[in-house]
């Protein structure tokens, strides 16, 4: 029988404390502080951030001291730009590290032509588009990377993302249709698909069978509208407060969670809200997000 408490683990991404795209943001927050805040708030783990140690033994000790786990870590693939062989070599090392820290998923985003880290490119109008041959290469490459992930006891979860070539529902459709479900799974990110398409449920319902990892990111509609009008970049949009933790924005997480539980989702739900930690206290917002999810989960416990 499906048991929500045993099937779903709650985690948080370090991106509320530190940001890998803008390293000076939140640099006063050490990885140990992030782990301690996550444990204090009652999360089961965090994803790996850029400030985390690359020595598995060091990280494993700090995790053990706090009773935490690592669900996964982001990997920027450049399959289209650099070719499959190059991506495989880098991903092999990535997966070896994730295996050593007992992770569950390798989160992959194809970053060829990505504008997510370009400060003066409007993320709402200037996203890249792949050609047919580039799509074919990408899907072949992801299948190859997925085999590597499986060999390390991991699942490759592809992250649809604003400012990339796989952002919209039709693009996710194409990726799912042309990759092998044995090797390529999907990360469902509420915030990215909401900003991109204006709705979260179509992607969730259409591709639930491929979803092996979930990010709960909320969106402030008034901030989003202002950033669209001002043609802001992805980085400036999050610095302006477009994203926040569940319950602090406008996404209907009650419906999202009802669907996940109703279809017996098993895996991690990771709160991910890239914000400026000077404006939005990371611990305070971690607690706010956790409280909202806990309230919603009460209906199923």
From Swiss-Prot:
Domain of life according to the entry: Bacteria
EC number(s) stated in the UniProt entry for this protein: 4.2.1.44
Pfam families xref list: AP_endonuc_2
Keyword Hydrolase listed: no
One GO term (biological process): inositol catabolic process
Catalytic activity: scyllo-inosose = 3D-3,5/4-trihydroxycyclohexane-1,2-dione + H2O
GO molecular function: manganese ion binding; myo-inosose-2 dehydratase activity
Cofactor(s) of this protein: glutathione; Co(2+); Mn(2+)
Top-level enzyme category: lyase
Record's keyword annotation contains Lyase: yes
UniProt keyword list: Cobalt, Lyase, Manganese
Sequence similarity: Belongs to the IolE/MocC family.
Protein name per UniProt: Inosose dehydratase
């Amino acid at each position: 029988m499906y048991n929500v408490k045993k099937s779903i683990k709650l985690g948080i991404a370090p991106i509320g404390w530190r940001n890998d795209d803008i390293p000076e943001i939140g640099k006063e927050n050490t990885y140990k502080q992030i782990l301690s805040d996550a444990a204090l708030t009652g999360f089961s783990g965090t994803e790996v951030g850029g400030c985390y140690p690359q020595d598995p033994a060091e990280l494993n000790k700090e995790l053990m001291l706090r009773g935490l786990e690592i669900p996964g870590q982001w990997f920027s693939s450049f399959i289209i730009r650099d070719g499959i062989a190059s991506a495989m070599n880098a991903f092999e090392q990535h997966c070896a590290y994730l295996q050593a820290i007992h992770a569950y998923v390798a989160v992959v985003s194809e970053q060829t032509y990505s504008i997510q880290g370009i400060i003066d490119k409007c993320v709402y109008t200037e996203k890249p588009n792949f050609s047919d041959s580039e799509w074919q290469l990408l899907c072949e490459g992801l299948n190859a990377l997925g085999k590597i992930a499986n060999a390390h006891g991991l699942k490759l979860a592809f992250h649809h993302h604003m400012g990339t070539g796989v952002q919209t529902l039709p693009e996710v459709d194409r990726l799912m249709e042309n990759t092998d479900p044995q090797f390529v799974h999907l990360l469902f990110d509420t915030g990215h698909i909401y900003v991109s398409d204006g709705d979260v449920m179509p992607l969730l319902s259409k591709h639930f069978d491929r979803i092996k990892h979930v990010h709960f990111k909320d969106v402030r509609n008034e901030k989003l509208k202002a950033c669209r009008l001002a043609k802001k970049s992805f980085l400036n949009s999050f610095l302006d407060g477009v994203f926040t933790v569940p319950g602090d924005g406008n996404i209907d997480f009650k419906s999202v969670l009802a669907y996940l539980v109703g279809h017996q989702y098993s895996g991690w739900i990771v709160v991910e809200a890239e914000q400026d930690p000077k404006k939005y206290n990371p611990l305070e917002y971690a607690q706010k997000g956790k409280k909202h999810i806990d309230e919603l989960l009460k209906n199923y416990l």
